Amino acid sequence: MALIHEILGKLSLEGNQSSSRQSKLGSVKAATHFDAEKDAAAIETAIKTKGVDELTIINILTNRSNEQRQDIAFAFHRRTKKDLPSALKGALSGNLETVMLGLIKTRPQYDASELKASMKGLGTDEDTLIEIICSRTNKELLDIQNAYRELFKTELEKDIMSDTSGDFRKLMVALAKGRRQEDGNMVDYEKIDQDARELYEAGVKRKGTDVTKWITIMTERSHPHLQKVFERYKSYSPYDIEESIKKEVKGDLENAFLNLVQCIQNKPLYFADRLYESMKGKGTKDKILIRIMVSRRNLDMLKIRQEFKKKYGKSLHYFIGQDTKGDYQRALLNLCGGDD
């Protein structure tokens, strides 16, 4: 079993990090002395083993980088003439199958697939739609759009338009376009004050809410800029931005704005909160738990773990250990990367 290296480093500014580059804050590092053919052969043997050798499959796929997993899938197809996803579907089941199938997709493919599933059939899974659209960078959103087009032969924006309505639709479409300013190094205090004042005047100060103004500011300004805007906002409004959102809008739009503000202020804490919510009380919201563990493992899992421990007193590793079991638990703990 390859060792999982814990490499702490400075969090890169969003937009400057290539989607193909391993983040220093990810919990899963590329395996050294990697041999795709050897891994593919081991997975083939594990699948053919009577009862299936899940442990071997888990140990390989949770301890390789995304690029290495793509190489393994290619090598597997070359040697068996079968697609790795199809082979895993036939060999695994339940939550473990969901995790393993998620791991062998590229990040854009995974997000695109989750978004498609959230809008498939009757009704919309707004929770998934909001989480992904609110938390991804411009580059990630562009990559998701391309993957969505390639996988489903339609446009992401078109599906969002047909599956949502009203101001919630406007917010989701504006975010999905990925047009946020990401040059957060320059501080424009005049613009910060102007945006804070306009947010106040478009909401709490008036009767009714100018949602379009809120959408424009919150989907186009950089995260560092908006963090300062939200601070400045308190000098105009008797309520902070989150309290103002709760007073001004309701339903999916309220939920979306609140998720967006959390992502802007502290994205790792946002995901830590989501993970906690997925495991607190009786039962587990496996869909949320799996999606975050799979999608953040190479990006900021170490930072998420840090925020989780700081806020909830016990480690993410501990919570997963208490809330899951068996091979599914083992896979998630490997993605978590260690205890704190």
Curated annotation (Swiss-Prot):
The keyword Repeat applies. PROSITE patterns: ANNEXIN_1, ANNEXIN_2. One of its GO terms (cellular component) is vesicle membrane. Adult brain, heart, striated muscle, liver, kidney, and very high levels in skin. Its main location: secreted. Residues 2-25 are annotated as: P10 binding site. Pfam families: Annexin. Signal peptide: none annotated. Gene3D superfamilies: Annexin. GO terms for biological process: positive regulation of receptor-mediated endocytosis involved in cholesterol transport. GO terms for molecular function: calcium ion binding; calcium-dependent phospholipid binding; cytoskeletal protein binding; phosphatidylserine binding; phospholipase inhibitor activity. The modification Phosphoserine is found at S27. A pair of annexin repeats may form one binding site for calcium and phospholipid. Belongs to the annexin family. Tetramer of 2 light chains (p10 proteins) and 2 heavy chains (p36 proteins). Calcium-regulated membrane-binding protein whose affinity for calcium is greatly enhanced by anionic phospholipids. It binds two calcium ions with high affinity. It may cross-link plasma membrane phospholipids with actin and the cytoskeleton and be involved with exocytosis. This is Annexin A2-B. The lineage of its organism: Eukaryota, Metazoa, Chordata, Craniata, Vertebrata. The gene is anxa2-b.
